[in-house]
Amino acid sequence: MKLTIISGRSGSGKTTALQALEDQGFYCVDNLPVGMLPTLAKQLSEGDPPIERVAVGIDARNLPAQLLAFDNILHALNEQQVRSEIIYLDADDHTLLTRFSATRRRHPLGTDQRSLADAIGHERELLANIRQRADLVIDSSNHDVHTLRNLMRERVARREATLSLQLESFGFKNGLPTDADLVFDVRVLPNPHWHADLRPFTGKDDCIIEFLSQHQASHDMLKDIGDFVVRWLPAFANSDRSYVTVAIGCTGGRHRSVFITEQLAKNLRAEGIVLQVRHREL
């Protein structure tokens, strides 16, 4: 059995993530008490027919003592020979505040004595151990419902028993991607932004590709990053990592980082490497 545990702070998209997996054939259970995970796994694996793919939502509504016992529960699942992975969804505090304000929903940990901001912070503390153990952390701050569903489908539901690689372009001016495992800075490359005729375009457009391809530094940077990824990707896989996100950043995240990400994806796919591409700022 493959057991996918979906956790994360309220408002980060856990329900959307579970629904996406359910649409892909997963047997889904939301808000299950942590202590019941081994029992559920045993019942479903021994069913007739046994259920092979299960997704369970775990959140801060569990008792604090159960959340503290999470490591012991994972050990019990391992003893049952259940393959488990943890997907943790999160978003920055401002985004969570905005989402709750927009929907006017009450936070699960909110009380008359605890403000929404305090509830969001308290939830982070309660789930810190689960986040630390996560195989994949998804920052949904810049995702809408549709892109989050697509991400879950491509990176989790359809993933074979191999490492899932994502290449992500971003702009440093908007902060580092919180889900990045490796970060490459390509701001040393010539910047199309300073050419007024090129500024409106992105690294996917022919004029930007032509501009950056004229500079040897672009080819050297692309080769060096590609060599690093190809060299060390097997090491990540051999260390039981299920997910790796390689983030490539420039100043605004629209020209140089997009160009390098697109070209790197093309080269890696030619090597037979399966991957997903995301451009955070586009």
UniProtKB/Swiss-Prot annotation:
GTP binds at D59, A60, R61, N62. It comes from the Bacteria. The keyword ATP-binding applies. GO terms for molecular function: ATP binding; GTP binding. InterPro entries: P-loop_NTPase (IPR027417), RapZ-like (IPR005337), RapZ-like_N (IPR053930), RapZ_C (IPR053931). The keyword GTP-binding applies. ATP binds at G8, R9, S10, G11, S12, G13, K14, T15. Keywords: ATP-binding, GTP-binding, Nucleotide-binding. SUPFAM superfamilies: P-loop containing nucleoside triphosphate hydrolases. Displays ATPase and GTPase activities. Belongs to the RapZ-like family. This is Nucleotide-binding protein ABO_0549. It comes from Alcanivorax borkumensis (strain ATCC 700651 / DSM 11573 / NCIMB 13689 / SK2).
